Amino acid sequence: LPGMAERTVILYTFSKKFAMTGWRLGCAAGPAEVIDGISKHNANIESCSNHFVQMAGIAALRGPDEPQQGIVAELRRRRDTLVDRLLEIDGVKVTRPETTFYLFPDITEVYQRKGYQNSTEIRREALEKTGVSFCSREHFGRPLPGEDKVFVRFAYSGIPVDQIEEGLERLAAFWE
């Protein structure tokens, strides 16, 4: 589109395609003045990535595509397992995302049925009773005005399918 290059910034991380979650490696492409501002801001938040991470990123970019196809297939298996198991729990609603390794299910009905007063309470009790850990909505900022649903976040990038199934079996028994 005309004028888009001058006002578009593309952010890229190595987390999904190369399974480098936690390595904090990525890049930004866009107009020079915007990238300069991002660089100055970023330098004040964190120092540069360490050398071995930079070298791993270069190797990932230059390497063959086949390993990424396996990574993506495995993440899809994990996603599908988690979504399917969550949908089996009475009172949980969740959509199947296309390109992420997080889920944000709506657990409002579970929350109300169990009589919780806040989402920190449901998160802590689930961890204590089932060993399943997830983030509450508050980890991502204050709820918006009028927000009345209870959402939590599950991450599945580093968890094998058998552990997802086992954890969701325990969580389902606890929540139902």
Where are the predicted features?
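PLP-dependent class I/II
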Residues: 1-176
